[in-house]
């Protein structure tokens, strides 16, 4: 979201744009950010261990365990982050936030753009990446192996996609699509 905003507000500073696992497109407080908000709400109303247990028993955690285990692992990590009051406020703020750009502004981005995304990621959905790749001209959408499937492949494919983009190997349509 920050990189998109910079590309829109300070285009003279941007030669290329990389958007990795986007959680926002143009709307603030998208539904995919709700799990972060839930964790923040629990941390603001309970002690961290009780909040962790409540979240682990929730429908959200069960869905994440089945569909997006890496997201669940990340969210569970917030319960041990100190100070918990700051973590709660940060999660609430991030969940309500947005990129502060609209579709017309994204359509005016005039630099090569790489969007990297994975399946099995409910907080950073592949559909969000697809939406951004349709809105921003000169975009290559690269889908890589989800961390929850194979972390080593995820890291290697992420690195390769970024390397290809930065070396200018993504100049033709589909060149960076796996």
Tell what function each PLM region has.
Residues 14-15, 136-139:
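Core-facing hydrophobic residues within beta-strands of well-ordered domains
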Residues 4-45:
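Flexible "cap/lid" loop of the alpha/beta hydrolase fold
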Residues 122-128:
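Conserved alpha/beta-hydrolase "acid-adjacent" motif
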Residues 138-178:
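Catalytic active-site module of serine/aspartate enzymes centered on a nucleophile-bearing elbow/loop
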Residues 109, 115-117:
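Short beta-strand/loop motif that positions the catalytic acidic residue
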Residues 119-121, 146-147:
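Acidic beta-to-alpha connecting loop that harbors the catalytic carboxylate
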Residues 70-102:
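Hydrophobic, aromatic-rich cap/lid helix
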Residues 22-31, 62, 123, 151:
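A short beta-to-alpha transition loop/helix N-cap that caps and shapes the active-site region
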């Amino acid at each position: 979201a920050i990189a998109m905003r910079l590309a829109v507000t300070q285009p003279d500073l941007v030669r290329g744009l990389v958007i990795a696992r986007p959680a926002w497109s143009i709307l603030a407080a998208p539904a995919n950010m709700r799990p972060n908000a839930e964790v923040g709400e629990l941390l603001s109303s309970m002690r961290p261990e009780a909040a962790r247990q409540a979240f682990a028993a929730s429908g959200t955690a069960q869905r994440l365990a089945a569909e997006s285990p890496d997201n669940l692992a990340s969210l569970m990590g917030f319960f041990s982050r100190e100070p918990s009051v700051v973590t709660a406020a940060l999660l609430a703020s991030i969940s309500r936030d947005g990129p502060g750009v609209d579709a017309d502004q994204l359509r005016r981005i005039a630099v090569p753009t790489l969007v990297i995304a994975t399946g099995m990621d409910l907080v950073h959905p592949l559909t969000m990446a697809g939406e951004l790749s349709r809105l921003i001209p000169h975009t290559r959408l690269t889908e890589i192996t989800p961390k929850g499937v194979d972390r080593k492949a995820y890291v290697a494919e992420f690195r390769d996609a970024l390397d290809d983009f930065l070396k200018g190997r993504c100049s033709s349509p589909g060149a960076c699509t796996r």
